[in-house]
């Protein structure tokens, strides 16, 4: 009988968090769901955040969708990342919703993006769609903070994107803007509009936007830490 069980309360230290995350490595999502007493969906079409929720249960995460980090007492954010058979990310990584108004005086140092990425527990998960969801395995975790160079890359992109938002150019921003950080619409449906600033400084309604890490950024950080081949 396995002694492994979900943490009932948030871990008291990074070491305890990492130890629990390491214990999950090698298990399938179906095994972890069964041990936690929750049902595994057939796919993620209607349950896009299910993997993250499952791992939050196992790791004792506290924040849910609140603005603080998932492990607020530790200042650590949990990010699951679907990878291919070579350990390369299969998609961009959501960071946080972008503020489209009220941005006067905001700096990179005080930004929500930097706050969310200050300390991240990355948990790779098999993401190939040919593998049934229940059979996808959890990989080795990585506790990461941005290096000086990574912080510089993120800051430059964030400043460029925020300048465009403040100057009323939000609707001109595409996913191609930014080297490592991009801004994309994030809405359940096209009717979920939010207020922003237009080209002449007037209030407009537009789709909510989210900040996402591009795959080249997450691939490089995973490759560096797991010594994967980085093409």
UniProtKB/Swiss-Prot annotation:
Subcellular location per the Swiss-Prot or TrEMBL entry: Cytoplasm
Source domain of life: Bacteria
GO cellular component terms listed in the entry, alphabetical order: cytoplasm
Gene Ontology biological process terms, A to Z: DNA modification; mismatch repair
SMART domains referenced in this protein's UniProt entry, alphabetically: MutH (SM00927)
Keywords linked to the UniProt accession: Cytoplasm, DNA damage, DNA repair, Endonuclease, Hydrolase, Nuclease
UniProt-listed SUPFAM superfamilies: Restriction endonuclease-like
Role noted for this protein: Sequence-specific endonuclease that cleaves unmethylated GATC sequences. It is involved in DNA mismatch repair.
Family affiliation: Belongs to the MutH family.
Protein name, as recorded: DNA mismatch repair protein MutH
Organism: Salmonella paratyphi A (strain AKU_12601)
Gene: mutH
């Amino acid at each position: 009988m396995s002694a492994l069980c979900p943490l009932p309360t948030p871990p008291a230290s990074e070491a305890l968090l990492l130890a629990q995350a390491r214990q999950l490595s090698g298990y399938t999502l179906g095994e972890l769901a069964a041990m936690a007493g929750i049902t595994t969906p057939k796919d993620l079409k209607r349950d896009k955040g299910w993997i993250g929720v499952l791992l939050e249960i196992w790791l004792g995460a506290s924040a849910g969708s609140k603005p603080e980090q998932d492990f607020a007492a530790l200042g650590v954010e949990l990010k699951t990342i679907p990878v291919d058979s070579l350990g390369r990310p299969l998609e961009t990584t959501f960071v946080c919703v972008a503020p489209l108004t009220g941005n006067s005086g905001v700096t990179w140092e005080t930004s929500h993006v930097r706050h969310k990425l200050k300390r991240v527990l990355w948990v790779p998960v098999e993401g190939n769609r040919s593998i049934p969801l229940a059979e996808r395995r959890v990989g080795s975790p990585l506790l990461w903070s941005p290096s000086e160079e990574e912080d510089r890359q993120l800051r430059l992109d964030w400043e460029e994107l925020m300048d465009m938002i403040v100057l009323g150019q939000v609707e001109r921003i595409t996913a191609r803007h930014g080297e490592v950080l991009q801004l994309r619409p994030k809405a359940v449906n096209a009717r979920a509009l939010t207020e922003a600033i237009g080209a002449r400084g007037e209030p407009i309604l537009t789709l909510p936007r989210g900040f996402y890490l591009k795959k080249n950024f997450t691939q490089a950080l995973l490759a560096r830490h797991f010594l994967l081949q980085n093409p």
